[in-house]
């Protein structure tokens, strides 16, 4: 029976922790990316994102500093630098994004009357978060051995 010295046991644990940290970061980044893709998936491809001109869909951005603004970056560029423990904020900068997500009933500032049901593209993606993380974990586990 082989015996591990204290040094080799410590090195084994060190390598295991390093791999676990790499996996955790990869799962975090991959899950956030998948969440964004799910929320932005067009209705024509089975998602809930309505697409007419593509402006709403293309206004999807992310930030590590707070809710995104028009100056924020695309999600993949934010995820490159994000670390475990940081928060990633995502959203759409199109002025009508909130109405498309939640719907709108009533008159707007110009007196136009609406009775529009919400599409729930972000909420439905957020509800799938546990499944998205599990999918990411399986994918990352096969990549980082």
What residues fall within each predicted segment?
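Short, intrinsically disordered N-terminal pre-domain segments
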Residues: 1-15
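Short, low-complexity, charged/polar segments at coil/turn and helix-coil boundaries
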Residues: 11, 15-107, 145
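Protruding loop/beta-arch "assembly-hinge" segments enriched in small, turn-prone residues
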Residues: 116-145
């Amino acid at each position: 029976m082989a015996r591990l010295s204290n040094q080799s046991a410590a090195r084994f644990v060190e390598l295991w922790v390093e791999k676990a940290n790499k996996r955790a970061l990869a799962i975090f980044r991959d899950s956030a990316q998948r969440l964004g893709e799910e929320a932005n998936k067009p209705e024509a491809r089975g998602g809930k994102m309505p697409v007419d001109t593509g402006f709403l869909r293309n206004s999807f951005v992310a930030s590590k500093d707070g809710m995104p603004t028009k100056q924020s970056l695309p999600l993949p560029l934010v995820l490159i630098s994000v670390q475990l423990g940081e928060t990633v904020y995502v959203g759409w900068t199109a002025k009508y994004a909130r109405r498309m997500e939640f719907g709108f009933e009533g008159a707007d500032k110009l007196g136009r009357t609406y009775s529009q049901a919400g599409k729930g593209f972000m909420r439905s993606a957020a509800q799938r978060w546990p499944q998205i993380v599990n999918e990411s974990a399986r994918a990352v586990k096969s990549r980082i051995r």
